Amino acid sequence: MQVFETIGAFRAALTAYPTLGFVPTMGFLHEGHLGLVRRAKAENGAVAVSIFVNPTQFGPNEDYASYPRDPDRDLALLKEAGADLVFLPTPDVLYPPGAVTRIEVGGVANELEGQSRPGHFSGVATVVTKLFNIVQPQRAYFGQKDAQQCAVVRRFVADLDIPVEIVVCDIAREADGLARSSRNVRLTAENRQKAPALFQALQETAGLFRNGERDVDILENAMRAVLTEAGLLDIDYATVVNADTFRREQPCSDNALALLAVQAGEVRLIDNMPL
């Protein structure tokens, strides 16, 4: 496994790998990330992974400074998972002095997370586009947990004619249903006990949907009731949207997606489930 910190050195190594799968990460890796790496390895001649906590996708009052980091542990896990190339840049490598260009995505990027976290998807789109230009993969792998991010990436990849296939992989979960996330390590014991209620709320709504319920108000109220009963009261959103547009429809379509965002102490938890 080769590790690079500069764009030039990374690009020089690419000539040895005619087909490449790519997994962009912010580090502090968990089984969800490693599952993406293993799938990328199985479906491509080689796999590249980036580790970069991207400052431009964090808001002024968000957790950039406290986001967990452990690059030595990450590299050991990636070697074990079969990664071939790791790109580990510092912020000044990707955002050198004088860099001012940002990518703004409309449509799907304006909904939900786009409203709750202004500027977030512009930061994501900018850094992912830069990484695609540097890595030049045939395929890139993302987790379904960040469902709206996946939709945003697919949108700008299509709009900007970037020659990469976007592969979205199932959510990795703990035994109690909590979606795996690097931020979970920051949950207090009390909030970790409450956190599986997100998955339970999604299951409750999925059950109603399977039984024919299409009234969005009823589906959303069912999710909120489960969260409230568990003591998760700081709900950013608990909604059912069209999985393509991320807009709320009444009644909901068969192409529906239930999504949650909840603040549990200092940690913002998100989860979703296709209905």
Swiss-Prot record:
Q: Which Gene3D superfamilies match?
A: HUPs (3.40.50.620), Pantoate-beta-alanine ligase, C-terminal domain (3.30.1300.10)
Q: Please give one Gene Ontology molecular function term for this protein.
A: ATP binding
* Entry EC number(s): 6.3.2.1
Q: Where on this chain does beta-alanine bind? A: Q57
* Cystine bridges: none
**Cellular component terms (Gene Ontology):** cytosol
Subcellular location(s) per record: Cytoplasm
Q: Where does ATP bind?
A: 26-33, 143-146, 172, 180-183
Q: Per UniProt, which keywords does this protein have? A: ATP-binding, Cytoplasm, Ligase, Nucleotide-binding, Pantothenate biosynthesis
Assign the protein's first listed, main location to one coarse class. cytoplasm
The family line of this record is: Belongs to the pantothenate synthetase family.
**PANTHER family assigned to the protein according to its UniProt record, in alphabetical order:** CYTIDYLATE KINASE/PANTOATE-BETA-ALANINE LIGASE, PANTOATE--BETA-ALANINE LIGASE
Q: How is the subunit organization of this protein annotated in UniProt?
A: Homodimer.
Function according to Swiss-Prot or TrEMBL: Catalyzes the condensation of pantoate with beta-alanine in an ATP-dependent reaction via a pantoyl-adenylate intermediate.
This one is known as Pantothenate synthetase
The encoding gene is: panC
